[in-house]
């Protein structure tokens, strides 16, 4: 069962099967996830895993994430962030849950300028969603569908409040 494709409730029996299948063993080897994002030589992102950028309000988190996204779009270096994306995984999904479309567009243009790309037309590898007008539950469902239905996705950014991550818990 792939959680990303099937996040429905599971029975106790299914949970036991998944528990057994999820046990790690020192007698087995596991594939290392490709390292796709680095800063100062340290890995900050791998393909298929989750990373978080946390900090106080107004601490320039969005600016730093913009530099990371720009490096990924460029598939190179921006402000000491280095991205090395596989050729078949170049799509970036940026989801903003707090800002107005006007401010989201400013962030989107900044990302494109930082990557050295034109900021007067859409870029096929960047999809930017402005979801402030929706409820937290709707935002989650919209983001899920965008993730599940975007081919060749390499990087997903969710820029928003942490309480959104707790909806339904």
Predicted feature residues:
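The Walker A/P-loop phosphate-binding site
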Residues: 7-111
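Long, basic/Gly/Ser/Thr-rich N-terminal segments
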Residues: 1-6
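Conserved inter-motif catalytic segment of the P-loop NTP-binding fold
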Residues: 86-166
């Amino acid at each position: 069962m792939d959680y990303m494709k099937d996040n429905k409730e599971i029975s106790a029996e299914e949970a036991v099967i998944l528990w057994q299948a999820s046990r790690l063993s020192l007698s087995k080897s596991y594939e290392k996830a490709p390292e796709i994002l680095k800063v100062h030589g340290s890995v900050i992102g791998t393909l298929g895993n989750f990373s978080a950028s946390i900090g106080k309000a107004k601490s320039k988190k969005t600016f730093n994430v913009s530099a990371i996204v720009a490096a990924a779009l460029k598939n190179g270096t921006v402000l000491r962030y280095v991205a090395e994306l596989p050729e078949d995984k170049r799509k970036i999904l940026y989801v903003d849950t707090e800002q107005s479309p006007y401010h989201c567009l400013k962030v989107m243009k900044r990302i494109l300028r930082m990557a050295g790309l034109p900021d007067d037309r859409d870029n096929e590898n960047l999809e930017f969603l402005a979801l402030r007008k929706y409820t937290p539950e709707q935002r989650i469902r919209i983001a899920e569908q965008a993730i599940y239905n975007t081919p060749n996705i390499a990087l997903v950014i969710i820029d928003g409040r942490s309480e959104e991550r707790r909806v339904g818990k």
